[in-house]
Design a protein with these regions (language model features):
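Short active-site segment of divalent metal-dependent hydrolases/proteases
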Residues: 63
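Bacterial N-terminal signal peptides
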Residues: 1-6
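Exported/periplasmic ABC-transporter solute-binding proteins
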Residues: 7-34, 40-43, 47, 51-57, ...
Length: 239
């Protein structure tokens, strides 16, 4: 038993907001083949990952979908510092291709789309920043009251997106990065939501206290031109 304990203790863990999965998988593969370093990577909703860190989970680096969660952890003394903004995310509306929905931001069209949808998929707004952005967008468009009784919540942005991909919900909201990924684009059309229709999705990452050097190196690599190029290719702006 003592042996397996030490193995667990030495394996560094990076926790990542679910919207970053396609980009992070690509960055990690590149990093692993360049350095031979391996980590455990766990994907989830930013708020859920934050709660686990507050409860003492042995995570070393938190790559969030927003700034609020990492800055709260920093204030509470869980992190090395306030971390760095590594990406600016974009929100997208998606529709299952089999449902014959033509996505549009024109007031009348959008109202019709929301009215005719029996379910609207989004990630839980209290734990998932992209779910929060979706609520802000619908509020700004004056459609929140029409929409809110139809919300089908995913535990994180991946599961919310999947509702639309499999047709359990005709429409939903996701990260633009996931909307353009091959797995999603095959089964769902997307519409990029203009940035001025929700609060900016500034994504911040923070090192949790006493990180192993291997994780500090990876954190620095995430700010490198190579990593930034991948993040950009996945539909984010980089600071």
């Amino acid at each position: 038993a003592s042996l397996s304990m030490s193995v667990v203790a030495s394996s560094a863990t990076v926790v990542v907001a679910a919207n970053m999965k396609p980009a992070m998988e690509e960055i990690y593969q590149q990093y692993k083949s360049a350095t031979g370093q391996e980590f455990r990577i766990i994907y989830g909703a930013s708020g859920n990952l934050t709660r686990q860190i507050q409860q003492g989970a042995p995570f070393n680096l938190f790559v969030s979908a927003d700034e609020n969660f990492p800055l709260a952890l920093s204030k509470e003394g869980f992190t090395v510092d306030e971390g760095k903004v590594y990406a600016i995310g974009r929100l997208a509306m998606i529709a299952n291709k089999g449902k014959g929905i033509k996505l549009s931001l024109k007031d009348d069209d959008l109202r019709k789309i929301i009215t005719s949808a029996n379910k609207i998929a989004l990630a839980k707004p209290d734990v998932a920043p992209y779910g929060k952005a979706a609520v802000e967008f619908l509020t700004k468009m004056g459609l929140i009251n029409l929409a809110k009784d139809k919300f089908a919540y995913g535990e994180n942005i991946s599961s919310a997106t999947n509702f639309v991909v499999v047709g359990a919900a005709p429409i939903g909201f996701t990260a633009y990065s996931l909307a353009i990924s091959k797995e999603v684009a095959r089964d769902a059309d997307h519409l990029l939501i203009p940035e001025n229709l929700h609060e900016p999705i500034r994504q911040r990452m923070v090192l949790i206290k006493n990180p192993p050097q291997s994780v500090v190196d990876f954190y620095n690599y995430l700010q490198s031109p190579q990593a930034k190029a991948i993040i950009k290719a996945h539909g984010y702006a980089v600071p």
